[in-house]
């Protein structure tokens, strides 16, 4: 829908002024925030939900090279045995370069043609578990308001370090807040007062 993760990511990526590189069915731009997914290509060193940013893209005829700035530090010893080039590390972040093949290998265990990350200007509440951001914007439409449990709401509002903004209608706000029991609501109210 209009407020779905894929649509929001597309809209926000369109505001990135860098050149679009289309690879398969996906579009990538230098500057795109990304999240590594369940692919085992760099596991366990770079795991599901590792955050990063695309800092370089070099498409070739049969492969594409991505340079990613990770929000974690990796040293040369940790990187040995993985199929990426560890470049410089600065301010607690490492930069890696790796290639993805255009076509699938005949080896069923080979993920060499699978891009191991997704563009992540926006992520679902479920996908955001365990992550932190300086600024969080939450969109809760009327259609999903009744599905937001206390635990889901708590997860959503506690992803931020500094700024929180919730976009919802007055009706959706009332539905969600009325669904919480008294003790938990006081805790949530305290958390919200600190960020709103």
Indicate where each model-derived feature is located:
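Core RecA-like ATPase module of SF1/SF2 helicases and allied nucleic-acid translocases
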Residues: 1-196
């Amino acid at each position: 829908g209009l407020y779905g993760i894929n649509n929001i990511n597309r809209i926000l990526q369109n505001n990135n002024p860098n050149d679009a590189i289309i690879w398969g069915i996906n579009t990538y731009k230098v500057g795109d925030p990304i999240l590594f997914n369940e692919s085992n290509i760099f596991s366990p060193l770079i795991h599901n939900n590792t955050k990063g940013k695309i800092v370089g893209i070099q498409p070739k005829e049969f492969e594409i090279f991505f340079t990613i700035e990770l929000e974690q530090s990796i040293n040369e010893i940790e990187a040995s045995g993985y199929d990426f080039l560890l470049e410089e590390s600065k301010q607690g972040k490492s930069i890696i370069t790796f290639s993805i093949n255009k076509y699938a290998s005949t080896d069923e265990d080979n993920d060499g043609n699978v891009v191991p990350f997704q563009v992540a200007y926006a992520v679902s509440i479920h996908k955001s578990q365990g992550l932190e951001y300086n600024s969080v914007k939450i969109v809760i439409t009327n259609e999903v308001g009744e599905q937001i449990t206390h635990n889901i709401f708590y997860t959503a509002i506690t992803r931020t370090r500094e700024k929180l903004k919730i976009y919802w209608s007055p009706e959706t706000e009332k539905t969600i807040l009325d669904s919480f029991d008294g003790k938990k609501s006081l805790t949530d109210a305290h958390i919200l007062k600190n960020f709103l």
